Amino acid sequence: MITPKVLSGFKDRLPKDAIQKAQLLSKVSVVFQSFGFVPIETPHLEYAETLLPDASSDIQKEIYRFKDHGGRDVALRFDLTVPLARFVSLYHQTLGMPFKRYAIGNVFRGERAQKGRYREFTQCDFDFIGSESLVCDAEIIQVVIASLKALDLEDFCVSINHRKILNGICEYFGISQVTGVLRIVDKLEKIGLNGVEEELKKECDLNPNTIKGLLEMVQIKQDDLSHAEFFEKIAYLKDCNENLKKGIQDLEKLYQLLGDLQISQNLYKIDFSIARGLGYYTGIVYETTLNDMKSLGSVCSGGRYDHLTKNFSKEDLQGVGASIGIDRLIVALSGMQLLDERSTQAKVLIACMNEEYFSYANRLAESLRQSGIFSEVYPEAQKIKKPFSYANHKGHEFVAIIGEEEFKSETLSLKNMHSGMQLNCLSFLKALEIIGENDEDL
């Protein structure tokens, strides 16, 4: 006999969990659509050569790669952005530019499993392809904020940086191993300052003074300073080199655009330590954390990638986008008790006291559905205690009872499972009114 078990880092979803996830995905999809983003789908499995060039060395170690039955070198996608580059390169002539897309799907990384981190997880990506305008960058951040608010989250911060600022810092200290250094800097939250310092010594062979100066600069943060105060504080960096100058100027323009959108200044701050480990980012980058749950890591991250299609096409299309980590958000929202705890999406359970009443019960259920009320019929004629227990377990808000009197008069008795109150022999229209209002004082 096979012992039923799930691989480490993977998970099953019971009905309650699956319902919660579906509800969150529905909410963010509505936000994406409200900004004009359209859905696309790409395969879970790609040629390895499609995915590998833009994966950092750390992510390459985490990629699920193997030979398929035809001997082809294939891999499971580790994000939805690299497949997007392949997709746009194939179809850009018919898509029309600029192209705004969103995609929701599972991705795979063989990282260490821990709370809020899985080896298979769902990403919700939204991207703006084919424009260099910082208006696109501002809109992506606007969508990030709107999406989190749609999930009833208010206490979060989008930490923003620019890859040119990081490149400029490396240039200032004469560091040539930019990609390797930034990959290590990106681990600051995970392994701490001492851990980053040790890796820079070991892997990049930097001298202590260079490491000290580098770490001092990448720890520059806006914190409680106003936007104007912070830009005044870092103005001197513009004189160091063109990368720093360009990066800071872009952030100044971005902040002007976000200000014009009247987004609360408490929701976004500059943090020079934000590097984003993926090598394809070229401009503004950002990570979003929940202020009371920073240990979960980023729940939404992204940035600008102006050369993503270079591996697939002579036409080098620009892009900017972000990815919402829905699985981490489920962990957070569960801890904050902001999730629907029901194991059903049906609002009403219809219970029959006699098998003869099922025809009427099914007609009643269909009438409720036609009125927009999700309903199900308990499949057995039982004493009422059993359907009540079933409704309590699954989370139905109402039980409609069909006994002899209700059957003969074509009415129903209605019990509110929250308040325990019951009204007998109601007309369909009266019951519909009560169910629609969800009156707790029934």
Curated annotation (Swiss-Prot):
Subcellular localization: Cytoplasm
Record EC number: 6.1.1.21
One GO term of the biological process aspect: histidyl-tRNA aminoacylation
Main location: cytoplasm
Gene Ontology CC terms: cytoplasm
Reaction(s) the record says it catalyses: tRNA(His) + L-histidine + ATP = L-histidyl-tRNA(His) + AMP + diphosphate + H(+)
Record's subunit section: Homodimer.
Membership in a protein family: Belongs to the class-II aminoacyl-tRNA synthetase family.
Name of protein: Histidine--tRNA ligase
